[in-house]
């Protein structure tokens, strides 16, 4: 019964909102988690009240971000159930998400980025692919899901830009720069055919399995070369943070950065001005004669 409700909600979200599969999978995991917790008290999603849901969402010891995400999924479910006539009320209406402290992204310096980008061995097909992937992610600020989801048709090497498919399947055009375009072009003509060995594949970045690389493989690629470059605590998303912060440091208008990142809300982008200011304060503290 619970699975049926969740399946129907996700189908509606896919048809009406065109949410991508990663988002839908996240909703499923959160709703199944809440359903399991409710079942321990003999309740179900269909008949839970506000107190039941509060107990299932606000669990001691769980990260607030996880609680907020689960509550968001529940709110979508009960809005849909009320609209479909499955329930006459919405028990999540008065439930508030927990306050979450903003995590300031760790800044990767331009010197560290240079070391990272220099790490792959471009004399090998895998190394040339990895070099192109790293260059592209730093040059464009793509989310890892956007980068691994690229087809070559999304890349215009002559104009030096890509068309990224972001959250909610929204398209945006992002400049990729000459250096990134050079390495993507070399990878496409030299390394990609060697990796595919005559097989066809729509994905731009391919693996030795002759299919598009996964998010997990992209994560491993970043971690491997970060280790070689002596950089700790880095992930594919760190390249997106570095891209945005370095642009802000060099004076690019925040709204332009917002468009390039695909942020719907400027407030989301403003975190990078704070990161840049923290970096600037550190530089002044280190080099100013009065510090």
Curated annotation (Swiss-Prot):
Record CDD domains: INT_XerDC_C
GO BP, sorted A to Z: cell division; chromosome segregation; DNA transposition
Domain Core-binding (CB): 1-82
A GO molecular-function descriptor: DNA binding
Domain Tyr recombinase: 103-285
Positions of the catalytic residues: 143, 167, 237, 240, 263, 272 (o-(3'-phospho-dna)-tyrosine intermediate)
Residue ranges of coiled coil: none
Keyword list, A-Z: Cell cycle, Cell division, Chromosome partition, Cytoplasm, DNA integration, DNA recombination, DNA-binding
GO annotation, cellular component aspect: cytoplasm
Keyword Nuclease belongs to the record: no
Pfam families xrefs: Phage_int_SAM_1 (PF02899), Phage_integrase (PF00589)
Localization of this protein: Cytoplasm
UniProt xrefs under InterPro entries: CB, DNA_brk_join_enz, Integrase-like_cat_sf, Integrase_catalytic, Integrase_recombinase_N, Integrase_SAM-like_N, Recomb_XerD, Tyrosine_recombinase_XerC/XerD
Gene3D superfamilies cross-referenced by the UniProt entry: 1.10.150.130, Intergrase catalytic core (1.10.443.10)
NCBIfam families for this protein: PRK00283.1, recomb_XerD
Family note: Belongs to the 'phage' integrase family. XerD subfamily.
Subunit structure of this chain's protein: Forms a cyclic heterotetrameric complex composed of two molecules of XerC and two molecules of XerD.
Known role: Site-specific tyrosine recombinase, which acts by catalyzing the cutting and rejoining of the recombining DNA molecules. The XerC-XerD complex is essential to convert dimers of the bacterial chromosome into monomers to permit their segregation at cell division. It also contributes to the segregational stability of plasmids.
Protein's recorded name: Tyrosine recombinase XerD
Organism: Neisseria meningitidis serogroup A / serotype 4A (strain DSM 15465 / Z2491)
């Amino acid at each position: 019964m619970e699975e049926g409700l969740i399946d129907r909600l996700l189908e509606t979200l896919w048809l009406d909102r065109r949410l991508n599969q990663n988002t839908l999978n996240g909703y499923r995991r959160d709703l199944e988690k809440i359903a399991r917790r409710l079942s321990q008290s003999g309740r179900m999603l269909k008949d839970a009240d506000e107190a039941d849901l509060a107990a299932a969402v606000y669990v001691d010891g769980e990260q607030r971000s996880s609680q907020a995400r689960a509550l968001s999924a529940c709110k979508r479910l009960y809005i849909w159930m009320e609209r479909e006539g499955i329930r006459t009320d919405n028990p999540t209406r008065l439930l508030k998400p927990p306050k979450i402290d903003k995590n300031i992204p760790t800044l990767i310096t331009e010197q560290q980025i240079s070391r990272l980008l220099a790490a792959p061995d471009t004399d090998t097909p895998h190394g040339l692919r990895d070099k192109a992937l790293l260059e592209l992610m730093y040059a464009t600020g793509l989310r890892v899901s956007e980068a691994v989801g690229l087809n070559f048709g999304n890349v215009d090497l002559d104009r030096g830009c890509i068309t990224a498919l972001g959250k909610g399947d929204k398209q945006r055009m992002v400049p990729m720069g000459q250096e990134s375009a050079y390495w993507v072009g070399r990878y496409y003509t030299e390394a990609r055919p060697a990796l595919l060995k005559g097989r066809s594949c729509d994905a731009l970045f391919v693996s030795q399995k002759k299919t598009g690389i996964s998010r997990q493989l992209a994560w491993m690629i970043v971690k491997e070369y970060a280790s070689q470059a002596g950089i700790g605590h880095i992930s594919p998303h760190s390249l997106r943070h570095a891209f945005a912060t370095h642009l802000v440091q060099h004076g690019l208008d925040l709204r332009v950065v917002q468009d390039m990142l695909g942020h719907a809300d400027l407030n989301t982008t403003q975190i990078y001005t704070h990161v840049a200011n923290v970096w600037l304060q550190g530089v002044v503290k280190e080099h100013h004669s009065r510090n």
